[in-house]
Amino acid sequence: MDITDRILQNRIVSKVIFFVLRSVTLSLVSVTRFSLFLLSFATITVPKWAYKIVTYSLTIQFNFKSLLFLFFVSICVVILVVRYRYLNKYARLPHEAPIKEAKLGPDTNIRPSEPRIGFQNYLDEFLSAISIFGYLEKPVFVELARHIRTQRVAEGNTIYLGEQSSFILVVDGCFQVFTAPEKDSAEVVEEAGQPEYRLLTEVSNGAPLSSFFTVLELFTELIPEATSKENPFKSTTSSLRPGSSTTTEAGANNASKPHMPQPKKARIIAKAKIDTTIAVIPANAFHHLVHKFPNSSAQIVQVILTRFQRVTFSTGYEYLGLSDAIFSIEKNFNSLTAYELPNYIRSDIIDDFKKEAMSEHLSQASNESFIVLRSKGAQSRLSNQYFSKAFDKEHGNFVSDIDRSTANAGDLLSSTNPHSTLLSTSVGPLRKFPLNRSYSREVGDYDISASFRDGLLQCIFKSLGVFNYELKEDNDDLCTENDSSEGDSDSLKKVDFLGQIAMMSATDREEVKSSIVVSTKKSTILEFAKEIEIIFYKKGTTIVRQGDHADGLYYIIDGFLDATCPSKLTFSTSYDTDLGMHSFMIKPGGIVNYQACVSNYRSFINVTARSDVLVGFLPRSCLERIIDQEPLISLTIAKRLISLVPSLLLKLDFAVGWIHLNPDQVVYEKNDPSDCVYVVLNGRLRSIEDERGSARTQVDYFNEYGKGDSVGELEMLLNNRRSSTLFAIRDSELAKIPETLFNALSLSHPAVGLQLSKIIANRMNLLLNNKSMDGMQHQPHEKHSIRTLAIVPSSSTGLLILFSQKLTSVLSVMGKSVKVLRQSSVLEHLGKHAFSRMGRFKLSSYLSDLEDKYDILIYVADSGVGSAWLQTCIRQADCIYILAEADQNPNIGEYEQHLIAMKSTARKELVLLHPERFCPSGLTRLWLKERPWVYAHHHVQLRIGLDNEISQNNEAKVFLNIIRAKVQNLHYGFRKYIDWKHLHPVYQANRAQDSDFARLARRICGKAIALVLGGGGARGISQIGILYALEEAGIPFDIIGGTSIGAFNGGLYAWEADLVPMFGRAKKFCGRMANLWRFVLDVTYPQAAYTTGHEFNRGIWKTFGEIHIEDFWLPFYANTTNITHSRMDIHSSGYAWRYIRASMSLAGLVPPMLSDSGDMLLDGGYMDNLTVSHMQSLGASSIFAIDVGSEDSREPMHYGDTVSGVWALISRWIPFIPKTSFPSLAEIQSRLTYVTSVATGEKVKSMPGCFYMRPPVKDFPTLEFGSFEKIYNVGYNYGKEYVEKLKTSHKLDDILSPRDTSKRHPKFLSSRRNSL
């Protein structure tokens, strides 16, 4: 076997060797052959072919026709390549998705609060009810909770609220509140079981059954009645000699004063509709609260007074037309509480005051209607002159060295320790008010002007009801129960709140200690008397204007005033209707501005000087300091006020509900029952119509309601269900007026029904005026009255404070009172715990008061991300400005992320800050596509240098952050250096009204000035001339809108807001349009139009390039006619050339333009050639509309019932045949297409706030673009004449001369300390 195997192995090896050697041999042979082939090809074949080619000859022959044909073919190829490769770059622009509108609906997870049952959320119900008290410190809350008790009331039982001396809260169930009608009314309500009562309202879970008036009565119950049975100026000496004992009665006019009226007890009962559980806080709880916490009690009373005024008074006056009831309070106060100065003071001093006032007026030669009389030093000339006369006459030069201890004439009061203070440190019954002061016997120290001021202050306090008295003894007995609840007395049980409050942490207790601020400053009456200003008003001067916030009390020293209360129904559209005028005369000793100053609210009356008048002005700040020193004085003032309130307002107080809403909280939903009307007291609401059944919520329409607006009257009267969903945009306060209240008041006071009818009529008129917008897409209606504005940075920036300062200064120049709120200012006013859990109530009350005092509040979010102040800014804003530097990274910043997380539905607007007045193409879209929730955007030029950066102490760190951010975003800054378009001169605003901040301020104030340009072909050149004339007159524009050629001109102006580049670009475009050869070469087979549209497209694209509409410096829109959906579309984003071309697309001349979604768009003039209605919906108050459309003949025609085209053609050439007017086919089609536009254009001429202009260019044809200079001059001359007419009629005063607030009432003067 071994031998055989070896033999086999040897054979195999030999075969392998053989195959290997064979393969190698064959490979070598192949390589050799290929090498020989290459060598042969290179040395023989190639030279041979080269020789043949060089020596080969070819002859080609062409005739002239062939050469001409080849030439034209070559030309066509070149034209086609250039046409479709280089000249239509506009068709190859990158597709830009349309920017979607921001979602303005509420969070779908937020719904109206469901009724709560039983005691599951009893503490929440209690907290909700006592929220009418405002901010409560925790010890005060514990004191109230300690006395609360519950009671079960069976169905049908009644409680007499008019006689109830407890605070009642409905925990579970429902009460019906009834009132007794007037004696002269025979109408009854049978459902109450008591035929003499009418239903006012229904009160259900969580709502207080007691009214504001009841709460004030509980706090002031122990305050004794302020009577004037005795003369307050009795037993004073008749001479000025110190120590004299001879007495006389001064001020004889005050000898017999009427008693103050007792507080009205309204006949109001509450009937349990079902078995109901109530919570009761008895009267003694409030009495103990007054003794233990006088400062907090005064604060609660002030909050209740303000809300009583803001809810009850304001609703009754502005909405229900109860001006007579409101006016009676001021009238009764002056008729019952007038305290004149003593005769020995009024005799000579007043004459000297008048002489000094007249001499000062003549010396100043001023046109001012008031003069603030000021002392010339510590010892005034007037006082020394008066004292020296009286002293020399009576006593010669004798002066006693003994300090005076008896009453002297001129002191008005008995002596007291000069170092006595107004407030001691003890807390208990009200101490006697130390209105007394003593003077030195030396003549140099005796200042009768100080005694005069003391007398004024005393008269003011006596008018307010502040006399020398002490509190009554507190009655600790519980208030008696009414008959209907006697059987349920066993169910009265105590509620344990202490367990809830014991859970408060040590930190919360520390917050309580720090939140109770007790003033330690002890001031004498002299220090407060120095605050009084002596002001002389000339006859006819308006001292108090209706709607102004109270800044102090006016005491009439001499002269007469007229107080008037115009009955006005003010609508949100600034439509006022005068319904009458109430008036009375205020005599010396009377008080002006009482109601507004006591409640710290705005005035309801106008007060003018009937004659030259001398008044003493006590600032509101001084009164507040006095109340801080002696808190219980506020209870006395409140008791005097509630004694003057008529019974009608008391009934209104029980029926009108006060509601506080959080952001995004829904008031009612669509299809809910309509049983009440809501009036916005503070905040902002939005109503929307949506489709809940669909997969996504489709917002079809919305409207916004600000302060003073009402919602729901039409549905309530028609007994229809709610047609929309209403929700709160931010923290809001509403007054709820039930339908039952309207029914009750309409029977006894028919004026209420008339008032409501006027509201409905005005609302229907607005709906009819808005019908012109039904054919377009549903667009949001901007509300004009922005009361609160939040400025939030996109990321950390040092321009936040500078931006807010510039905006505030412009708003102030426009006549608006503005308050800027920063975190530091709020903390300084409210303390370090202002943003704590309990401090939010105090913060909310503080912000509400500021909103009542100022026209606009600006919240500057200058805190860190996620801070409580940032959340407050967002929650309180009607509109949010997101501040960003345009040359930075457009990604969403950290502040914006926090804003998105809060899901705020307030309108958010992006403000892009540019160092130059220029925006590169496409830059704005980079910012907007990342922020679909942005509603609008603004371009603002804000230059900042190193001086501005380091102007504040804390700017060093900010400056470093700016440097770091600029380095990180450096590649964005290179855009302006490499873009050739930036090399053109940049426009600079030279006038104040042309600045970007003035434009923002006008938008905020609802005074935006808009420009609407109509279509008309070449006649639109005249619009440029009119614009030049308007700009010469100083008229700025904030929003631009246009149709057809108006869209072209408007786009050019909105691009850079400068007429110089606009003029050049427009003239260049008209030159292209005047070249008819361009359109001849563009003619094609008339499938969709007679031309391809290329030359038209290229002419517009050569003008605008790749710029987007959102890159325009001014807001701009163009309208088109969407023939796919038969509607009018508004375009405010996308490529400018594309939508301007769509707005200029005449049917038949150029094909329709396609939108991004494939819709066919034609000239917007077919639907509305002058879009004034849409411009009004954007918030413009003044609109300049320029109409250059063709005027069709309105002459009647008489061509018969049939028309022969042949006879019409022949009749033109036969002279002896009577000429008959025949319409052409083109004219008929043109009139047909413009039917809708003509109808809307006629309405424009009569719209309020619209300045309609129609230059005389009807003789120029539509395509007469070659007459540029001629048409331009016609427009310019017409514009000059129109502006002169407006100036002559003073219609441009508000636009050209914004109201300046530098000359205002003397209560705003800074130097008050030197007034006499």
UniProtKB/Swiss-Prot annotation:
SMART domains: cNMP
Record's compositionally biased regions (Polar residues): 233-256
Topology in membrane: Multi-pass membrane protein
Transmembrane segments: 24-44, 62-82
Keywords: Endoplasmic reticulum, Hydrolase, Lipid degradation, Lipid metabolism, Membrane, Repeat, Transmembrane, Transmembrane helix
GO biological process: phosphatidylcholine catabolic process
EC numbers: 3.1.1.5
Residue stretches making up the PNPLA domain: 1011-1176
Lumenal side: 45-61
GO molecular function, one term: lysophospholipase activity
Principal location class: endoplasmic reticulum
Short motif GXGXXG, span: 1015-1020
Family, similarity comment: Belongs to the NTE family.
Protein name: Lysophospholipase NTE1
